[in-house]
Structure formats: C-alpha cells, structure tokens
C-alpha cells in the first residue's frame, strides 16, 4: 500500500500558487443580536464559473449560543510534509473553529460533501482549561507535530495566555506547547517558525 500525501499539501509556495483555485469558502457567521441563536459556519460559492457564484450554498449552526467564532483554520497543511515530523497521511478536511467568548473548540468535517459541513466534535472549555491551563482560544495554525492554538488568557479570565496543541487525529488537547513564554502575559496571535 502506497501512502500518498493529501493533494492540497504543497512542497513550496510556488506549487501552491500553481494549484487549482478554491471553489468554496467557509465563513464564520456571528450572531451578535443577543436573540439566543447560535453562530454558524456558512459555505460560499467562490467559483466565478458557477451559477451560484457569490451565494451561500451551505450552512451549519453551532450547537450552543454565544460562542463568537474566531480565527479558524484547517487541521492539516503542507507542514505535514515536514521531514522531522512527517504526517503525509493526514487529510485537510476538518475545520478547527474556536469560540472566543465560550472557549469551546468545534471540529467541523467538510467531507464527504463540502457544501454540507458537519460538526463531529466539540471540545468543551473545561477540557481545554484542565489540559492546557488556558482559555479563550484565538487563532489556529496547522503544524508538523500537531495543531497549534493561541489562547488569550487563563481560565479565570486573567493571564497568562499562551499556545497549546491539539492532536492531529483525535483533536484532543495535548497541553501547553511553549516551554518558556517569556515576558508576554496575555496571548494573542502568533506566527509559527518566526
């Protein structure tokens, strides 16, 4: 059996730029009305040749109100090809979607039908806090040895914030990623590799 990397993983930025363009976009739809309805993930057709170009073609409600969906991203990317921690068999199919206000993390499967994404897992804030010591997940980045998430602060609403990791396959929180956070107190965004 030959293992083949996900075709959306590219060995260079040049190869990524030469790849076919995306035809769908996933967009967080926040409900800031206070009416008790949840946020949603909507699917927008971005294929200029499509009859439904620019229209919402899919919709998935979150299971709880008040999440405030934030900087979400894919579970896997080209970093899975990294020679020191290769995971060429992971597939870019899950959106990892943090709720900034609720501290929940939603795992949304975009297959088998990318227009009908389904929530397959919700990581509750108590689990994030117990395993990482953080809350308010903010930004996700896929990485060679896990999925990295920045967190704005601690479960008590104060600092310190930092970065924690999720497992590529189970999406379970693995714990804090950084060894030493330095002088920063509240976390925000981050850029792996810098």
Label the model's feature ranges.
Residues 1-47:
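Sequence/structural signature of beta-propeller modules
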Residues 2-21, 68-91, 133-144, 188-194:
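Structural signature of eukaryotic scaffold interfaces centered on beta-propeller domains
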Residues 30-32, 98-100, 110, 152-154:
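Short loop/turn segments immediately following the C-termini of beta-strands
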Residues 34-37, 90, 100-103, 155-160:
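Short, solvent-exposed loop/turn segments at conserved positions within beta-propeller repeat blades
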Residues 40-42, 104-106, 162-164:
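A short loop-to-beta-strand structural motif that recurs across blades of beta-propeller domains
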Residues 53-139:
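Blade-loop segments of beta-propeller domains
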Residues 109-194:
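Asp-box/WD-like beta-propeller blade repeats and closely related beta-sheet repeat scaffolds
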